[in-house]
């Protein structure tokens, strides 16, 4: 059986093409053939036997980079399980030629047991919303069967476009209240999803409209839009060093974990690396030291939130905002809030930008806190937090209340479309468990030995980013002041935050553990280099960081199952001022040595372009693949 994995035509980075081959190789458990141009395959058997419609489908909307897909010749395997997980592919085709009596057995083996014998009389079969089967009969009784699969990830990315369609964009004329307004929007979303699924099956001869006035879903999904598609809740909040969702999802596949397994991110941040795990039937645990990161991750990973309760809470909130604005006396609380923010920011530019909006922000926050459901309250507060970040980064004349309402509506509609599509595809958004734990990855006493099926993470890159500064005002408004005890997350590398007691006893006491930690030669060489360059403070930060990372490696080794994998995304190189000159130092090998020093085997290193919005001092990343 041939399997052709056709990459998305709108890949955002050429490196994604090569990462896509890594992913499909892992999913198929074989080495695929790199296909530069798909049309050249039409000269080969069995592609030269395909009908025109199938050839048109395969060669339509191909990537214009260095390659267009990957080909494998393998025994029949369950392809449906693969299309539920694959990241970088617009379509995946399976093609096989066999005797008539074998067709049903092969279809069953690739994950399509629902096809009936009488259906094989048809030239085209649509067994489900994401599959098409094309059958061609030969005179000798054999049949050429082509199965076209639409990967779930592609459909979930495209479903975010339905909220741009006229039925969902324009406020209906008969909307007299928020209840009716949201009902009409939901009807528009559902109509758009039906249009999307129908178009993906039958709209392949339609040319997209590129200009203004787009009215058809094909105008949005059939061309490489410059707009970044934002599936699920990946982009609901700005957070330093946030990983690219496509890379994150593919990393889960490189771990070779199966449904029901559990993955761990020991430096989970805002949850980007594990947010897709529930969509793939995988359980996930994240460890995060900052309350703001944990709170964002809790929301981001909760795609199965009760939409009925959420809509009721949003309508109640909007009605409250519309009828009660500024009727409350907030002068005393507003004064206290301003003083607190002024104290921690020193009246910097961010404070000056946000100060005119603080009264309205405080009003919205108090209105949100009336919500009874804690999950919904957290969701609403995080969206408010994002507006705080936006308004503290740039001077904005617009009303923050209207901006918040618009953003909340947008995120609700994304959730609504995601849940509706999940129902159609049979994806249980609450079928897997995700737990975000406030804690320290150097002391994961909440996890037993040999219980984790795979680890993936992107730890802090030495001293490249401050994960607190851009969220400082938001942290203060949300009342997460504990996050500011370190001033900078670099302070967390210090020995006094390492502990040997239970994980939930923060802040931690001073331990002498650091003094007994042996670092590899590559780590010591870097520390000595910084010390000789009169960078005493910098050398100490780096030394603390490396010791912390070694302790984390030890804990990860302890909890990971035998022969399982740990994928770490880390900066390939780093720049420091040494003896008055900027020096670029290869830092990825230093982390690799640390992993090996606790027992891990380094089985692969994957280089790729930066997958983060906040580059800091980093240009290229390495993915270190360790195995226990």
Label every model-predicted segment.
Residues 6-257, 287-521, 571-594, 605, ...:
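Nucleic-acid modification enzymes, centered on SAM-dependent nucleic-acid methyltransferases
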Residues 260-267:
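Conserved class I S-adenosyl-L-methionine
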Residues 271-275:
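Glycine-rich SAM-binding Motif I of class I
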Residues 283-285:
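Short beta-strand element of Class I
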Residues 480-484, 560-566:
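Short glycine-dipeptide loop
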Residues 531-546:
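Surface-exposed cleft-lining segments at the edges of enzyme active sites
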Residues 546-562:
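A short glycine-rich, Lys/Arg-flanked "PGG" loop and its adjoining helix->strand segment in the class I
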Residues 561-564, 615-628:
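Core SAM-dependent methyltransferase catalytic element
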């Amino acid at each position: 059986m041939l399997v052709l994995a056709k990459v998305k035509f709108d890949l955002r980075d050429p490196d994604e093409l090569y990462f896509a081959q890594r992913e499909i190789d892992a999913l198929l458990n074989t080495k695929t053939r790199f296909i530069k141009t798909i049309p050249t395959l039409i000269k080969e058997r069995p592609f030269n036997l395909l009908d025109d419609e199938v050839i048109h489908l395969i060669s339509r909307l191909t990537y214009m980079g260095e390659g267009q897909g990957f080909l494998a010749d393998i025994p029949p395997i369950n392809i449906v399980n693969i299309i539920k997980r694959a990241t970088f592919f617009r379509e995946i085709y399976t093609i096989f030629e066999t005797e008539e009596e074998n067709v049903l057995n092969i279809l069953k083996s690739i994950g399509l047991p629902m096809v009936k014998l009488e259906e094989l009389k048809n030239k085209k079969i649509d067994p489900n919303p994401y599959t098409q089967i094309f059958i061609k009969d030969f005179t000798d009784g054999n049949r050429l069967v082509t199965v076209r699969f639409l990967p779930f990830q592609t459909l979930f990315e495209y479903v975010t476009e339905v909220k741009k369609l006229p039925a969902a964009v324009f406020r209906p004329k008969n909307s007299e209240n928020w209840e009716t307004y949201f009902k009409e929007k939901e009807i528009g979303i559902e109509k758009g999803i039906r249009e999307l699924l129908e178009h993906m099956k039958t709209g392949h001869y339609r040319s997209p409209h590129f200009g203004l006035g787009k009215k058809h879903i094909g105008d949005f999904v059939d061309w490489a839009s410059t707009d970044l598609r934002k599936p699920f809740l990946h982009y609901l909040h700005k957070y330093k060093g946030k990983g690219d969702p496509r890379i994150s999802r593919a990393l889960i596949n490189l771990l070779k974990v199966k449904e029901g397994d559990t993955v761990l991110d020991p430096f989970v941040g805002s949850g980007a690396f594990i947010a897709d795990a529930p969509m793939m039937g995988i359980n996930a645990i994240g460890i995060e030291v900052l309350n703001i990161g944990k709170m964002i991750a809790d929301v981001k990973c909760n795609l199965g939130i009760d939409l009925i309760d959420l809509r009721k809470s949003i309508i109640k909130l909007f009605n409250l905002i519309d009828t009660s604005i500024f009727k409350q006396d907030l002068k005393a609380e507003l004064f206290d809030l301003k003083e607190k923010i002024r104290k921690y920011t020193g009246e910097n530019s961010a404070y000056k930008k946000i100060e005119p909006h603080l009264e309205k922000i405080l009003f919205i926050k108090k209105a949100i806190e009336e919500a009874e459901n804690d999950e919904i309250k957290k969701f609403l507060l995080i969206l408010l937090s994002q507006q705080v970040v936006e308004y503290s980064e740039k001077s904005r004349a617009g009303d923050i209340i209207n901006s918040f309402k618009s953003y909340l509506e947008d995120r609700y509609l994304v959730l609504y479309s995601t849940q509706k599509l999940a129902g159609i595809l049979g994806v249980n958004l609450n079928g897997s468990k995700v737990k975000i734990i406030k804690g320290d990855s150097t002391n994961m006493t909440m996890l037993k030995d040999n219980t984790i099926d795979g680890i993936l993470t992107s730890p802090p890159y030495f001293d490249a980013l401050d994960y607190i500064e851009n969220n400082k005002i938001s942290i203060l408004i949300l009342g997460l002041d504990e996050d500011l005890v370190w001033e900078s997350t670099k302070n967390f590398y210090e020995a006094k935050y390492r502990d040997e007691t239970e994980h939930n006893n923060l802040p931690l006491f001073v331990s002498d553990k650091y003094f007994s930690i042996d670092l590899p030669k590559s780590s010591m060489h870097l520390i000595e280099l910084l010390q000789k360059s009169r960078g005493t403070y910098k050398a100490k930060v780096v030394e603390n960081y490396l010791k912390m990372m070694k302790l984390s490696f030890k804990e990860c080794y302890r909890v990971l199952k035998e022969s399982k994998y740990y994928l770490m995304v880390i900066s390939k190189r780093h720049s420091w001022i040494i003896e008055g000159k900027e020096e670029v130092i290869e830092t990825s090998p230093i982390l690799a040595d640390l992993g090996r020093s606790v027992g891990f085997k380094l089985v692969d290193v994957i280089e790729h372009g930066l997958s983060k919005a906040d580059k800091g001092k980093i240009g290229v990343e390495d993915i270190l693949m360790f195995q226990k």
